């Protein structure tokens, strides 16, 4: 039951009560959040504030009905809402400093590990490739080629130029043999031992690995990368490996230990959600919107959508009572348009479905004509008006519609009946009937809720929406 009150609750408040729903106050800011969000740029059916009041009250009444039905206590509701709460709250449990500290820790551990193994080297190489089953003659040819290149380099030949011309490692050859920085354990030991033994600028004699002969030039040496050059990579590693979540869980556990016995991560997250919501109205209303939206969906499903969709007896009764609503101006054809490979199947299709319920036609035809790998008949089923289907237009409505033959199916036909004034059965317009029946159930339900619960709207506060 609705009341319009002339007395404004909390008149001097910066955020006065705009209405009460069953005794529970609704602030002006909450109403504004919902109104502005649902009337933003791009919304087609915009409402005035006064028009929106009824929609908002109906929404709140449905949520109240869901709470009275204890939907908020179900396991499925709790699981879905807590997942959403976690998405909003968990990231706020740690600061960028916490993540930075973890990144520094990972960096220092990697730096120590690499430094202990000899640091990093920056080699370039020229590879003369040898297959694992290379003959002795092939090995000798490769060795001589590598030796020849090495001797040319010792006489001042350009390493990068020779790499581009002769190296069989195409990935590095285009870069003058450069394979960037490596540490121990990143490539084969023979190669590493040679690379780490060189001085910067020095070129190795040809060395043999499982890949073939390498001539290595050392471009540089260092203990490890500077932190700033790998920081972003480490941060990506932290997210990819779930380390951020581990840090959050450690923080939650740490805080829980300072709280009364029985407190756990959920306790801490609830407290954090309350704390954040107290300082951020947008977050508060965003979480409430999700919470109430879950309740609204489930209660609407129970009271309207599922009931309308599943109660075929009620659908039929609604159709019978409102049959005039479903009349159409022009005749429709209820049946099938079909295409066959063989002329004989045109009559066979009609014989197959004649006298059978329309709802069974598709399955009957599938079993008789298309059960094996050869599809003998292609079928389009429905209720067609003029212009919906060229075969129906041509053969039923006798228009000059252009019919394009389906490849491999030269014979077109139709079977069914013309409905002149409207559908004979509710199933002919079932989707339409269900939608209309849902609307009726919705209106009846809302009317019941408006009688069951009392709500008060304060016009003076309503007049200040978005004007303060």
Task: Enumerate the predicted regions with their spans.
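Bacterial Sec-dependent N-terminal signal peptides
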Residues: 1-16
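Peptidyl-prolyl cis-trans isomerase
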Residues: 12-26, 32-468
């Amino acid at each position: 039951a609705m009341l319009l009150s002339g007395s404004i609750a909390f008149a001097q408040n910066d955020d006065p009560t705009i209405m009460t729903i069953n005794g529970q106050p609704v602030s002006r800011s909450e109403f504004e959040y919902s109104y502005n969000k649902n009337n933003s740029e791009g919304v087609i059916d915009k409402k005035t504030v006064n028009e929106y009041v009824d929609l908002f009250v109906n929404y709140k009444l449905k949520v109240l009905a869901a709470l009275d039905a204890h939907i908020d206590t179900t396991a499925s509701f709790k699981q879905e809402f807590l997942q959403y709460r976690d998405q909003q709250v968990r990231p706020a449990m740690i600061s960028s400093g916490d993540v930075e500290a973890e990144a520094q820790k990972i960096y220092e551990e990697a730096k120590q590990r690499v430094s202990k193994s000899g640091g990093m080297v920056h080699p370039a190489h020229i590879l003369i490739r040898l297959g694992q089953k290379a003959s002795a003659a092939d090995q000798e040819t490769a060795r001589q080629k590598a030796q020849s290149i090495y001797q040319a380099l010792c006489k001042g030949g350009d390493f990068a130029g020779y790499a581009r011309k002769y190296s069989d490692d195409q990935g590095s050859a285009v870069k003058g043999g450069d394979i960037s920085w490596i540490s121990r354990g990143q490539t084969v030991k023979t190669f590493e031992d040679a690379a780490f033994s060189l001085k910067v600028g020095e070129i190795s004699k040809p060395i043999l690995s499982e890949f073939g002969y390498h001539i290595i030039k050392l471009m540089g040496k260092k203990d490890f990368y500077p932190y700033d050059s790998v920081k972003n990579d480490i941060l990506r590693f932290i997210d990819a490996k779930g380390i951020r979540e581990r840090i959050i869980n450690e923080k939650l556990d740490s805080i829980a230990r300072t709280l009364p016995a029985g407190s756990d991560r959920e306790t801490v997250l609830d407290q954090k959600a309350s704390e954040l919501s107290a300082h951020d109205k947008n977050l508060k209303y965003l979480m409430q919107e999700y919470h109430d939206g879950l309740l609204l969906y489930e209660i609407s499903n129970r009271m309207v959508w599922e009931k309308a969709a599943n109660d075929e007896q009620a659908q039929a009764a609604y159709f019978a009572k409102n049959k005039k609503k479903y009349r159409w101006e022009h005749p429709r054809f209820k049946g099938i348009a079909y295409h066959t490979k063989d002329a004989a199947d045109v009559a066979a299709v009609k014989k197959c479905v004649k006298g059978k319920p329309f709802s069974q036609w598709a399955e009957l035809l599938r079993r008789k004509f298309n059960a094996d790998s050869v599809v003998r008949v292609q079928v389009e089923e429905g209720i067609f008006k003029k212009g919906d289907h060229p075969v129906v237009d041509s053969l039923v409505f006798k228009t000059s519609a252009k019919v394009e033959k389906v490849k491999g199916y030269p014979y077109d036909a139709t079977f069914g009946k013309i409905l002149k004034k409207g559908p004979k059965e509710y199933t002919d317009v079932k989707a339409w009937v269900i939608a209309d029946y849902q609307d009726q159930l919705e209106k009846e339900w809302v009317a019941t809720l408006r009688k069951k619960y009392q709500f008060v709207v304060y016009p003076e506060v309503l007049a200040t929406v978005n004007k303060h």
